[in-house]
Design a protein with these regions (language model features):
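Helix-coil boundary/capping segments in enzymes
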Residues: 1-182
């Protein structure tokens, strides 16, 4: 039986290096992802995947989103690099991957619309956004062109939760027990 796991995270090492250079204040997030072997070392990840015949993934890039550490002038380039890198991984390993979920520079609406079209042309299966844009509601009217582009190019939107270690999933917890934000 074939199973497809949608929205499983990975961190392309080249993308992480570029982002850490751009945003040293967020380096801890990239280092954390790089220290999870199956998230950043594709040989290690593929070894795990080999153990599950018929299982494939449609991966996306793990947090943090580019809009949290790059302004609207730099985030488009970083989102494009991330999408290029994840596409390379998927194309190099078709036995494990059915496609990828693309990231967009949500803090630059015009560039997001352009990246959505490019993602469609690249074969992306969907677009990843986060539950808020640096504290702002994602249903704000200025973001509607992003949703219209996803509709136009028939790309589903997958919404990634945003929080952090100190933001619990449940009211009676003091911190995130399951790290759903990561």
């Amino acid at each position: 039986m074939k199973s497809i796991d949608v929205f499983c995270h990975l961190m392309p090492p080249e993308y992480a290096k570029i982002c850490m250079a751009e945003a040293p204040n967020k380096s801890h997030m990239f280092v954390r992802a790089l220290n999870v072997a199956s998230m950043s070392n594709m040989d290690a990840r593929n070894e795990v995947l080999k153990a599950f015949p018929g299982y494939k993934q449609i991966p996306n890039i793990v947090s943090p989103p580019v809009e949290t550490f790059a302004g609207p002038d730099k985030s488009p380039r970083l989102a494009a690099i991330g999408n290029d890198e994840i596409k390379k991984i998927v194309e190099a390993n078709p036995e494990f991957y059915e496609g990828f979920i693309a990231g967009i520079p949500f803090n630059n609406v015009k560039a997001s619309v352009e990246e959505i079209k490019r993602a469609k042309d690249m074969g992306a299966k969907g677009i990843q956004i986060y539950t808020h844009m640096n504290g702002e509601a994602i249903d704000t009217e200025k973001y509607w062109p992003i949703y219209e582009a996803c509709e136009k190019y028939d790309l589903p939107i997958l919404i990634h939760p945003v929080g952090g270690q100190m933001v619990p999933e449940f009211p009676k917890e003091n911190r995130s027990k399951y790290e759903l934000w990561f």
